[in-house]
Design a protein with these regions (language model features):
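Acidic/His- and Gly-rich active-site-bordering loop/insert found
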Residues: 1-103
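Fold-level recognition of mixed alpha/beta catalytic cores in primary-metabolism enzymes, strongest
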Residues: 98, 103-123
Length: 123
């Protein structure tokens, strides 16, 4: 998955294939995925629930690349590592947790600094 996403090198708010790849990976592992959150087409929220209550653990899946430099900042690695960590925790938690959830947030537009801020503002 990392090689695939690295080959895309999509710019801020254009991370269509990257967002689809990460959210499909999570969906295939039992996460409920909502795409287009916070008014951004490529943002997503993936949630795996063990039941009502806590703990709640969240992972941030960064996705965008730099114009002319590709993934020089490593958001491809952050995105894949976060999605894999979320999936691993969900799998581990099936036999351990009776409550709580794992959330993976696809956070676009990291390079301009507005993606996460928009997601916070929109709840």
């Amino acid at each position: 998955m990392l090689r695939e996403i690295t080959s895309y090198a999509e710019l801020p708010l254009e991370e269509t294939r990257t967002s689809e790849t990460l959210s499909a990976f999570l969906s295939e592992r039992g996460f409920r995925v909502k795409r287009g959150v916070a008014g951004m087409e490529t943002a997503f929220r993936a949630e795996f629930s063990f039941g009502k209550g806590r703990p709640v653990v969240a992972f941030l899946c960064e996705m965008d690349a730099l114009p002319g430099l590709g993934h020089a900042c490593g958001h491809n690695i952050v995105g894949v590592a976060s999605a894999c960590a979320a999936a691993a925790l969900a799998e581990f938690g099936k036999g351990v947790f009776r409550a709580g959830k794992v959330i993976a947030l696809g956070t676009p537009d990291e390079e301009t600094g507005f993606g996460k801020a928009r997601m916070v503002e929109k709840g």
